[in-house]
């Protein structure tokens, strides 16, 4: 016998929500999913009327659902926001070029302005070229650092007030686990924040409207809404450290469905003992971007790439590391030694 929707008790249920276990029809699922995101936005006070908001758009399921729901809620509840799409072209042939075609279709479907910034334009490097230098082991480090800064730079070009990204509950829980495993207290402290910005640091505030939305439900929403999105995984990501945290989280979820939200809530309630020294935010002496060091991570990685020392900003530091970052000239002998070192 068909299962009835547990909400309206009139229509046939088409799914069982991974998040709550409720059996719902399509319409009730759509409403519940959208209303939960609306509650997240309003309870956290993510936006103010009149603001210009850039939606980080990759063409994937998360950013496509985010763009769709943000436009819908902005109209349904009269948020009074000006929405834009902002995409980053990392320069990954056979992946990002295809996904950007999806973003361009989304632009037409949602009638939102679109800005695309590229690694090549901003840094003089594409990810394809970087992978040739560093291999597949550490390429995600470069991409993550460059992408974050590229989004900020693109947002500054558009003169927006805020950036919203498609990070979902699974992403946040994975990040909590990764920071615990790495012992990264500074990142662990801020990774669960739904809105990130520091007074006076010059960075454009970012927020995560999908912070409590399960990845499985985002997929179901996109499927039943027949949204146009790009579903191929990045060709360079199989070796990413995040994959181990994801696999562990999936194992936990299979035993305890609330594990994702439980991990997020654990991260939110963690406190750092007094006396633990935390990094002090300043600005990069070279590019002016926010940094707790004299040079930001992006400039350190670029310095290594441009010097033919791609692993300079990764892992153990060589004794000449400080000299390089201080932009002091190296002797020919020092250059030869560095190029022979596996950092």
From Swiss-Prot:
Gene Ontology molecular function: nucleotidyltransferase activity; tRNA binding
Gene3D superfamilies in alphabetical order: HUPs (3.40.50.620)
Enzyme class: transferase
Keywords: Cytoplasm, RNA-binding, Transferase, tRNA processing, tRNA-binding
Key word RNA-binding present: yes
E.C. number(s) listed in UniProt: 2.7.7.-
Pathway: tRNA modification; 5-methoxycarbonylmethyl-2-thiouridine-tRNA biosynthesis
Family annotation (InterPro entries): CTU1-like_ATP-bd, CTU1_C, Ncs6/Tuc1/Ctu1, Rossmann-like_a/b/a_fold, TilS/TtcA_N, tRNA_thiolation_TtcA_Ctu1, UPF0021_CS
Subcellular location(s) per record: Cytoplasm
Primary localization: cytoplasm
SUPFAM superfamilies in UniProt: Adenine nucleotide alpha hydrolases-like
Origin superkingdom: Eukaryota
Gene Ontology CC entries for this record: cytosol; cytosolic tRNA wobble base thiouridylase complex
NCBIfam families (alphabetical): TIGR00269 family protein
UniProt family annotation: Belongs to the TtcA family. CTU1/NCS6/ATPBD3 subfamily.
Name the record gives this protein: Cytoplasmic tRNA 2-thiolation protein 1
Lineage: Eukaryota, Metazoa, Chordata, Craniata, Vertebrata
């Amino acid at each position: 016998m068909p299962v009835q929707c547990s909400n309206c008790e009139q229509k046939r249920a088409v799914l069982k929500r991974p998040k709550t276990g409720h059996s719902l029809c399509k319409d009730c699922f759509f409403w519940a999913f959208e209303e939960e995101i609306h509650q997240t936005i309003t309870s956290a006070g993510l936006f103010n009327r009149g603001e210009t908001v850039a939606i980080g758009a990759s063409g994937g399921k998360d950013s496509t659902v985010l763009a769709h729901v943000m436009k819908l809620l902005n109209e349904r509840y009269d948020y009074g926001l000006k929405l834009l799409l902002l995409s980053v072209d990392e320069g990954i042939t056979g992946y990002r070029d295809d996904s950007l075609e999806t973003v361009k279709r989304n632009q037409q479907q949602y009638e939102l302005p679109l800005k695309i910034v590229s690694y090549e334009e901003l840094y003089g490097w594409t990810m394809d070229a970087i992978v040739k230098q560093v291999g597949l082991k550490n390429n995600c480090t470069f991409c993550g650092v460059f992408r974050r800064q590229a989004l900020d730079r693109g947002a500054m070009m558009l003169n927006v007030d805020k950036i919203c990204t498609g990070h979902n509950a699974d992403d946040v829980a994975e990040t909590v686990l990764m920071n615990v495993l790495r012992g990264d207290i500074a990142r662990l402290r801020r990774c669960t924040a739904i809105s990130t910005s520091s007074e006076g640091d010059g960075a454009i505030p970012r927020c995560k409207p999908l912070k409590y939305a399960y990845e499985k439900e985002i997929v179901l929403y996109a499927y039943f809404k027949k949204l146009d999105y790009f579903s191929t995984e990045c060709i360079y990501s199989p070796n990413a450290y995040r994959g181990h945290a994801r696999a562990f989280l999936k194992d936990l979820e299979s035993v305890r469905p609330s594990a994702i939200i439980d991990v997020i809530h654990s991260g939110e309630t963690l406190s750092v003992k007094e006396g633990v020294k935390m990094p002090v935010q300043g600005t990069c002496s070279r590019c002016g971007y926010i940094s707790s060091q004299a040079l930001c991570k992006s400039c350190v990685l670029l310095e290594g790439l441009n010097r033919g020392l791609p692993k300079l900003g990764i892992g153990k530091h060589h004794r000449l590391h400080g000299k390089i970052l201080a932009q002091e000239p190296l002797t020919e002998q020092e250059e030869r030694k560095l190029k022979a070192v596996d950092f």
